């Protein structure tokens, strides 16, 4: 997959937050990944009440899903991140996770504050759209 990030100087510097303003992708297979949360392989929450731990676990789960689809995190064109309102005042853990998992050519990303997710212990959920060759 070919992916090219565009970050016009007329838009704010989103790279400091770990995402690109625009991503143009070319490939032949589209991968849609359901929202990933901080569950381990047994369905147990990782990092209850801890946005940092939950963010990193959700991103690890996303990486696992991409491998299962035959791709890598580098193939992700866009992310949609849902953050519970109670945790949205300090989003540094989310930024830190994005910078750690997408250090180069990060995907386009939308952050959405929500009143709650599927379970009360979830603070973040991340869904992805990728393009593979």
Where are these regions (language model features)?
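N-terminal presequence-like segments and the immediate start of the first folded domain
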Residues: 1-60, 64-77, 84-133
């Amino acid at each position: 997959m070919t992916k090219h990030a565009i970050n016009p100087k007329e838009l704010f510097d989103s790279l400091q937050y770990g995402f690109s303003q625009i991503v143009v992708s070319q490939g032949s297979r589209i991968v849609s990944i359901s929202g990933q949360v901080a569950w381990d392989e047994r369905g147990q929450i990782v990092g209850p009440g801890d946005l940092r731990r939950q963010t990193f676990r959700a991103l690890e789960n996303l990486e696992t899903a991409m491998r299962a689809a035959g791709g890598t995190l580098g193939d992700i064109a866009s992310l949609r991140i849902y953050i519970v309102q109670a945790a949205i005042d300090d989003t540094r853990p989310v930024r830190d996770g994005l910078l750690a998992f997408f250090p180069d050519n990060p995907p386009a990303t939308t952050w959405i504050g929500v009143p709650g997710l599927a379970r009360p212990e979830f603070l973040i959920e991340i869904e992805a759209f990728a393009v593979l060759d």
